[in-house]
Amino acid sequence: MMKTVLLLVVLVGVAYCDDDGWDMGNFFQQYHQWQQQISSSSSSSSSSGGGGSSGGGASGGGGGGGSSGGGGASGGGGGGSSGGGGLTKVVLKAGGGGRGGGGIVKSVGGGGGGVTKLVAAGGASGGGSVSGGGGGGLALLAGGSAAGGGRSGVVTVSKQPIIINRQVTHVNTGGSGGGVGGGFGGGRGGFGYGLYGGHHHYNPCGYGQVYSYYYGCQSIYKQPARQVYHQPIYQPVQTVYQPVQYYQQPYQYQHSYGQASHAYQPQTTKYISYSYPQYSSQGSYPIVAGGSAGGFASARSGGFGLSSGGIGGHSSYPLSVFKHAKGEKYKL
């Protein structure tokens, strides 16, 4: 049975993976057929996956309800750990209820190579922590729930920036060893991270610049993490005209009558407005990690480890969250 599953995985991978891009419509259509076949043939291949979802094994699972965060710390499931080659798609479902609406969902690594796709269906208010990547050649970003609760979307492959909770990240299409880490749906807003050959690949503005939802790409100065970056944004200068002064301008000829003329004196007072966008410290720490796990678990292979139970590891410059203070006027 496992040989049949692996053969089907290889065939799907060969049919739907190429060098230029993915045909995600045909991929998901084929995947649903593949999932039905596997779920009917491997329901007894392993124990129940987590808190009430049978299937397990190559069919994914690791979910179900529960009072301690649904998926709990076990999470994961099936096909991704076998790796091999070709295409492996794993669906991680974090059950509702409990801590964070989904508990801690551990990632399922890609193993040897090929393609690993992680799709996370998070719960309310956080949806747990989902990460991906392993040693596979390509791993897709898995998004957690939004900060306000609700379901998370399925993040697909793209070479363009993807907006996640008003923050920009990239889905990596290469890289050795690390692949792409997953997305997080934390209690205070999601954020994404990834590796591309060991380098940052989540900032669409380039080195030395940061993306702002309000101002676009802004230059920053490289400073230690969790600092407030004061980058003055100069507003157009406003010219204020004073009241017009009137005076008589007599003609040169003695018998001519005088004529009043209006002379506009541009006695100006210039005001310049400074606006200080501030880096928010709530839920927007770009994390560099290169392991098969991550988030609230600990990274296993390479990169920077993430501390258990919170946000840690190696922080870099801010990603996209700004608090722009009210502009104050200064008289020149």
From Swiss-Prot:
Source domain of life: Eukaryota
Composition skew (Gly residues), residue ranges: 48-81
Subcellular location: Secreted
Keyword set includes Signal: yes
Region named Disordered: 39-81
Annotated tissue distribution: Prismatic layer of shell (at protein level). Expressed primarily in the mantle with highest level in the mantle edge and lower level in the mantle pallium.
A GO CC term attached to the entry: extracellular region
Signal peptide: 1-17
Major place of residence: secreted
Keywords: Secreted, Signal
Keyword Nuclease: no
Protein name (database record): Serine, glycine, tyrosine and glutamine-rich protein
Organism listed in the record: Margaritifera margaritifera
Lineage: Eukaryota, Metazoa, Spiralia, Lophotrochozoa, Mollusca
